Design a protein with these regions (language model features):
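Single conserved hydrophobic/aromatic residue that forms the stacking wall/gate
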Residues: 1-8, 12-13
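FAD-binding core/adjacent interface of flavoenzyme oxidoreductases
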Residues: 10, 14-100, 176-184, 195, ...
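A Rossmann-like FAD-binding core segment of flavoenzymes
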Residues: 14-41, 51, 118-205, 303-336
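FAD-site-proximal beta/loop scaffold in flavoenzymes
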Residues: 58, 80-90, 192-244
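Rossmann-like NAD(P)H-binding beta-loop-alpha module
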Residues: 85-134
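A conserved FAD-binding loop/helix module that cradles the flavin
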Residues: 237-284
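Surface beta-strand/loop "capping" patches
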Residues: 270-315
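Short, aromatic- and glycine-rich surface loops/edge beta-strands on solvent-exposed regions
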Residues: 320-322, 348-368
């Protein structure tokens, strides 16, 4: 959108918000959202307020999974951090969490922190990953681990944390195909810090209050091609919708959701109630496709459609196939695909012109 490479602070474009005279409220928490689009907020400046919105865009982001979600045996000593917390301590506060580090999970933040801790003078002993593949981008594995000689142990997890007041070490063990530790494979690593990069959870508490249906795979809202949820007038974008790799995709989604919400709010006549089963068709995910965004589309498409998805296993040379009403409509070859990297396929407008009404749409992967 900016036609340039920008850092996060430059992407904020606060001057545009002020130039367009957009009202914004800082230090304000949204307490509740109803299906009728009534937003309840609370702040020290205004107290509790209620706003009747014409359209709402959900953009609450996601949070890191904490240690409590992992059920790792051991005491609760100092020195256990989520990777994002450690990132803030190092980058913004100027503190080094520890000197001898073990990282559990190979998500992008964990990989980046392995490099960052090394550059700050700490020693990263190992990165352990429960799955048989990394959860991060390939370039981050190369630039953050391989370039610094940091070992990555796949199909391994932490089975015990040692130490009472401060972390003294962790025990790793190899896991089987059901993610169960294999007896006899335990290894002890002395460390004073354990960083957890074990996934992100979309912040959808407000979505549930608004009775928005959630995708059990992504834990984010089910949306159509306009990023509108099944609650009329409520849209979603970014990490609250599904976890992203790149902020470029987040920004593009935000633009789409904002435009669709603005168009909805500007309509003189509100949309009539519609039945999801009659108006929409669900996108079926098969052959290695874990999920798609959007998860459903209108039966009649007049524009091109960009589908983003993740695979559920590592693929070598493969092809992505789109079927419309049981017939192959589009095929795209790829050198590789992995669960840690989001994929996308653009279905051109001319493909939909050949179909009067979409009764079935299916996305699948096939190895070459």
């Amino acid at each position: 959108e900016m036609s340039a490479s920008l850092v996060g602070s430059e992407m904020c474009i606060r001057d545009r918000v002020e130039a367009l005279d957009i009202e914004y409220r800082l230090n304000t928490m949204v307490m509740d959202i109803t299906k009728e689009r009534v937003v309840t907020t609370m702040s020290s400046e205004r107290g509790i307020c209620q706003i009747q919105a014409d359209a709402i865009v959900l953009a609450m982001g996601c949070r890191e999974r904490p240690r409590g979600a992992l059920n790792i045996p051991g005491y609760r000593p100092a020195g256990i951090y989520t990777a994002g917390t450690a990132q803030r301590l190092v980058n913004m506060e100027g503190y080094l969490p520890g000197r001898e580090v073990v990282i559990l999970g190979s998500g992008d933040i964990g990989l980046i922190m392995a490099r960052r801790m090394t550059l700050e003078g700490a020693h990263v002993n190992v990165v352990a990953e429960l799955m048989p593949y990394s959860g991060g981008l390939k370039r981050n594995i190369v630039q953050c681990l391989d370039d610094y000689g940091i070992p990555l142990k796949l199909s391994h997890t932490v089975v015990k944390i040692h130490g009472k007041k401060r972390v003294e070490g962790v025990t790793l063990a190899q896991v089987d195909a059901q993610a169960r530790p294999i007896p006899g494979t335990e290894e002890f690593y002395a460390c004073d810090t354990l960083l957890l990069s074990v996934g992100l959870l979309p912040e959808n508490e407000l979505s549930r209050q608004a009775q928005v249906s959630l995708n059990p795979v992504t834990n984010g809202p089910l949306v159509d091609e306009n990023l509108e949820t099944d609650v009329e007038g409520i849209f979603a974008c970014g990490n609250v919708l599904h976890v992203h790799d790149l902020v470029d995709f987040v920004s593009e989604e935000a633009t789409r959701a904002g435009k669709a919400a603005a168009e909805y709010a500007q309509r003189a006549v509100q949309k009539t109630e519609h039945s999801v089963t009659e108006t929409f068709v669900r996108i079926q995910s098969e052959g290695g496709v874990r999920y798609t965004v959007p998860s459903q589309i209108h039966r009649k498409q007049e524009k091109g459609l960009n589908i983003r998805f993740r695979v559920n296993k590592v693929f070598g040379a493969c092809k992505v196939q789109v079927y419309l009403n049981g017939e192959l409509a589009l095929e795209k070859k790829k050198k590789s695909a992995a669960p840690g990297e989001m994929e996308q396929i653009l279905i051109p407008e001319n493909v939909f012109e050949k179909v009067a009404e979409i009764k079935e749409i299916r996305l699948q992967m096939e190895e070459l």
